[in-house]
Regions:
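S-adenosyl-L-methionine
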Residues: 1-128, 132-133, 137
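Short loop/turn elements that flank and shape the SAM/SAH-binding pocket of Class I
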Residues: 146-149
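Conserved residues in the N-terminal Rossmann fold of short-chain dehydrogenase/reductase
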Residues: 140-143
Length: 149
């Protein structure tokens, strides 16, 4: 029964997609995905630049909203880095990229290496880097760092 209902629902979506492609030249499924995800993005001002973050849940939305006030000592530490071209910043446990993105904006000529082993965080991290066009500044390494073999 569930298979039949799923198939009927899928068939209706495919039909709507075809009709709307003819009428509007745009896929209904892509439009619907964009519509649903539109509220999943939050913008904040970091160093006089509007930076977007993908925040698919309330916890991540809170993290983005409080990133400039929650751990001011971390931001002060990044601010204290000597300005030089060969600066390499390791963000160990990069999560969704708050500090990786902050460093790449603050220290424009630096290279940021974001270590993040969690696949769900990795998906969000790479999206946040991409939507802010920081792929050249931030390299993602999808493994954990440890002192154990």
């Amino acid at each position: 029964m569930v298979k039949k209902i799923s198939y009927i629902f899928f068939s209706i979506l495919v039909f709507l997609d075809k009709v709307l492609k003819i009428l509007t030249k745009r896929s209904f499924l892509i439009w619907f995905k964009d519509f649903i995800q539109e509220k999943s993005y939050k913008s904040i001002n970091i160093l006089d630049k509007e930076i977007k973050f993908f925040v698919p849940n309330q916890l991540l939305e809170w993290r983005v909203k409080t990133c400039l006030t929650k751990e001011p000592e971390t931001l002060q530490w990044i601010d204290s880095f000597e300005k030089k071209e060969n600066l390499i910043f390791w963000d160990i446990g990069a999560n969704i990229g708050l500090y990786s993105i902050y460093n790449s904006l603050k220290n424009i000529n630096s290279t940021t290496i974001a270590f993040e082993p969690s696949s769900s965080n990795l998906r969000i991290l790479t999206r946040n880097i991409s939507i802010n066009n920081l792929e050249k500044n931030i390299k993602v390494v999808p493994i954990p760092l440890t002192n154990k073999e």
